[in-house]
Amino acid sequence: MTKPLAGQEVAKQIEGQIPEAVFESNESWVVINPDSLLQVAQFLQTTAGLEFDYLNCITGVDYLDYFEVVYYLTSIQHNHSLVLKVRCSQENPQVPSVVSLWRGADFQEREIYDLLGVTFVGHPNLKRIFMWEGFQGHPLRRDYL
């Protein structure tokens, strides 16, 4: 079992290198601005003592006023984990793709795109993975029905 890192402590490290990247944090997670996602992800992956080299999973959540993309990260070397979140508007739901950093994000980003309609900018093959091409809408959205 991995040791979860305190979100507030990691947020301080992020802010020390990437000012204005952190939107909110607590003991369990860090929410960052979408424009900073790639820079923060690379920082978390390459910084000594953090080295989050493994992306466990990505999920999407449809809240009343926004979408949230949640990244569950693990450092195999240090046996610790972190929950990283990014929020985007429902009117223009898009965040940068992290496939260039964690190849395992490929199908997970496609799933979130297919079922929630969040666009992952820079994804090398962003197309539906469960629903057929031409399917109208995104079935896990609150407003689907």
Language-model features, listed with the residues they occupy:
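Terminal low-complexity/charged segments
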Residues: 1-145
